[in-house]
Amino acid sequence: MLSRYNPADIEAALLQARGELPFPPGHRREDWAKAASALGGPLCSALLAAAERASASQPAPLPATLWLECKRTGQRETYERPRAARRQALANLALAECLEWEGRFLDAILDYAWAICEESSWALPAHQLDLADVDDPIIDLGVAMTALELAELDHLLGERLEPALRRRIRSEVDRRCFRPYLARHDFWWLYNTARRDVNNWNAVCNGGVVGAAIYLEKSPARLAAMIAKAARSLDDYLATFDEDGGSSEGPGYWSYGFGYYTVLAHLVESRTDGQVSFLDEEAIGQIARYPLRTVLSPGRYVNFSDCSRNVHFCRAHLAYLGRRLGIPELEGLANVQPLQPEKESLTWALRSLFCRPDPAAAAPTPAPHDYFRGMQWMIARYDPADPEALVLAAKGGHNAEMHNQLDVGSFIVHLAGESLVAELGAGRYTRDYFGPQRYEHLAASWLGHSVPVANGHGQLPGKERRATLIAHIASPAEDCLALELREAYPQEAGLASLQRRIYLHREPPAGWVELEDLARFGSGPGMLESPLITFAQVELGPGYVLLRGSRACLRVQYDEAALKVRVEEFANVDLAEGPQDVRRVAFSWRAPSREGRLHLRLIPGQG
């Protein structure tokens, strides 16, 4: 447990340590020349060009009425986009100045950094709908990330910054972050409570605030108190992972939350000469391997809950973890991630220059079988060495997970780099998507998932709405996940039992997926429907349905005598990655029955 670290021992470690930080300030020209050489001419040029564009412009205005757009209309982007543009410009300017060290970006850095310090709040309006009360600052994701970015700006440029700006950074970070962090215990993201559990916010907020303190806080006692508080808090974050290192938030939020956990761990180890380590916990190795175990095909990952369908990891995060923990596969995965420092935050762009993967590390090959026991996630691969081969991902779990969707029993069928039976990922992030109307959005509702419908009733939210594991089988011939789903449904559904069994069979030439739903109704005959959610084109034939994607085709075979099928179209569904047409292919019994079976065979490449 990280809470074994108490303030007294941490303060002693701080006083004994040399206190070196992992990233060189800009005046260490030899280090920066090596970084520029490793980055390469084209990427350096792109970074300098981005800085020149920022230098030729002014910080985008952020008027109070723009803040209120989220409260008034529910839209977040109108404020978040110009806010993010300010921080991106500052990151590019700071790194360009460190690469050149000629002073030509210093005035623009002053303008952008001063404008950020002038913001009434660094929070996001979605997290604080009313205009900010400057006398009662909150700490959210935006506050914590901004604090770390300004602290690292100060570290990199030091005395080249205007003295007043350096004083302002310290004053603002102390007022907005350090004082409320030490004084308050009621931020929802700090600890697991009876009201709610923590999620990625815990790691990001702790990482940003305490990471900034490692750079800026001069009092060893005060810094020790913050590190100790973070240690206790981060124990609750680590508890959100299951015993196999799985996070129900998905790979995208793993990258975000565990990324900031790693940022803080790196800084704490450096500042204490390794006497305080957040990476020596037994669970860390399993958590670090999570992206290796959730891959569907290169660049595509299991995207249950609000996870994006297109996940990119921070190269520096994977590279550092791989080297620090002795997991070379993470360095191999880092090598196939995009490197675009001019599009990254200062936090990650800086690390991309100095935490580089071994270029000889090969892209990893996943295992045939992966299973996360606590979450009841199964990933089964027909041929892990073939990136085009069939992959099945299925889940149990419950309906109060982090970034929850009503998806107990849902699954993905992935072939040739695309999911033909798909998860929609997140809906567009708006005020309502995170409010009482969340489950009215197709992406979060049972209607937008490949889960059964009993007597017209879908699943309900709540931790008690869960799957019970019947069996998980992983063998050379097949993988199977068998679940009892009855508790996910309301009493009105009339279910005595609803079992789902889903298999990946490894029969040549390409394998196939089998879906078997077994329903028993308690009070009388009932109806069962099992849909497939897809972005693919749908073609109906006698006893089969074709799901035709851009690169592959899946043939869904069913018994016409027992089942009927209908196709529902949802045009321009408002998803986080943009509007997209979605199709729901619903198979159902032809007549009500007290009990029965719904059986589908999903066969690759039979178009």
Predicted regions and their residues:
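Non-membrane alpha-helical segments in proteins
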Residues: A85-L99, D111-A115, A144-H155
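Carbohydrate-active enzyme catalytic cores, enriched for enzymes
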Residues: F258-L420, A474-S475, A591-P592
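CBM-like, beta-strand-rich accessory domains located in the C-terminal region of large
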Residues: L129, A144, E331-K343, Y429-G607
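Long, well-ordered core segments of solenoidal/helical folds
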Residues: A51-L62, I109-P125, R168-N192, A225-G245, ...
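Structural helix-adjacent loops and short alpha-helical linkers that scaffold large soluble proteins
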Residues: E97-L110, L153-D174, A213-A231, V268-I284, ...
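Active-site lining segments of carbohydrate-active enzymes
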Residues: L131-G252, V263, L350-A363
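Extreme N-terminal leader/anchor segments
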Residues: M1-L47, A84, L95-C98
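Solvent-exposed loop and edge beta-strand segments that line ligand/cofactor-binding
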Residues: L21, G74-R87, C98, A126-V143, ...
